């Protein structure tokens, strides 16, 4: 019998323009992640190339998928079979698709439990997570799931191999899956279970996907490195896309590209990617999250460290356009990012975190930074309002730095020199920027109660604390990380 996925168009069960889903994947992927992550969170890999679409769109696709894979090494990742969603993509009806996915998952879990009960032996390990690791959807392709990006890519790679085995078998005769008892004895092999039990404990942020806005420099860059160290996958985002990519490249260079040869486009990525985004443009932010869904399948935390300081002109006046620019980034931009992220979290139905960056200036009134200070005061209250609006699904908190000069794009050389001049600190304009920055940082340190410079790493540590279980019951709170500025004490 000919393999129907190779006989286009005669072998197609559905016919879609260009073979791909004619509705956006963004509403579907996070929904699936939430459904399969009821026990433990998963990271996804999406494959929607021509080969995969021919399979999921074919007449024989559902039946072949039901037979499962035939290689023991494969179904340790892919499980005994994938979930094939019974849906007509020509309709483009998202709600019908969601219902089909939910119903399919209920049946899949029942089938897996029945398979376990039917095949288990007296000494078999306890049943593992009954959720599928491979989901096949006509018109959309395949979404593979794993505890991290490498595992989901390997799972996707293995199912690609399974499709090739099916194609070859169907081309010459008929494909047959492995006997279920034999498959079970391999999947629940005591030595395999022993290997799983010897695995090191998961890190605190394992299985999580964090989006960091402002990751091109300073606090954002430091935070990206900090959360990856704890197991998170990181989407490094910046208005300067090259800077965002540079941060992601640093992470990949340190931790490696991962394993597994699968995933279409951006989904064939490692533990970090770098993307550009204008946080004041809702379309740009929505596009960012759509890309994140394709890359990793969902989000668990969104951290905004991007901000802007615009000094007044020589007369001490802030022009209207510069006022709008400051509030556009420090307040409106933070709100747009949080609002678009909230939409994703509601689709996932998984709890998560949003962390903003405000400032000690939010509560300290002074001359020379009118637009910045008032925008940060607004950002402080934005945190509280969002915490109320987005509870109980999300915790919303912030860190409030003060005078983080090192690595900050808000302290370019000219501003550092202006500040040194303002405070009558001796310097020579021939000095390197790093030396000038250190002088200013040390000056600011002397004004604090702890007498220590405040660096990006200090903010990153506070952000990690808010992300962690240690402050898992804290929301609507701003943590000052300013060395102790008594004028900045929150009241």
Please provide the spans of the model-predicted regions:
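Canonical Rossmann dinucleotide-binding motif of NAD(H)/NADP(H)-dependent dehydrogenases/reductases
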Residues: 205-235
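Conserved glycine-rich Rossmann-like NAD(P)H-binding loop of the short-chain dehydrogenase/reductase
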Residues: 232-246
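Short C-terminal tail/terminal secondary-structure segment
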Residues: 309-312, 464, 475-491
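Substrate-binding pocket helix/loop in short-chain dehydrogenase/reductase
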Residues: 313-315, 319-324, 444
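Catalytic Tyr-X3-Lys loop
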Residues: 319-335, 355, 372, 379
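A short, exposed helix-loop element centered on a Lys and neighboring polar residues
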Residues: 338-339, 384
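Alpha-helical segment proximal to the catalytic Tyr-Lys
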Residues: 343, 388-392, 472
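Residue(s) in the substrate-gating loop at a strand-loop-helix junction
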Residues: 359
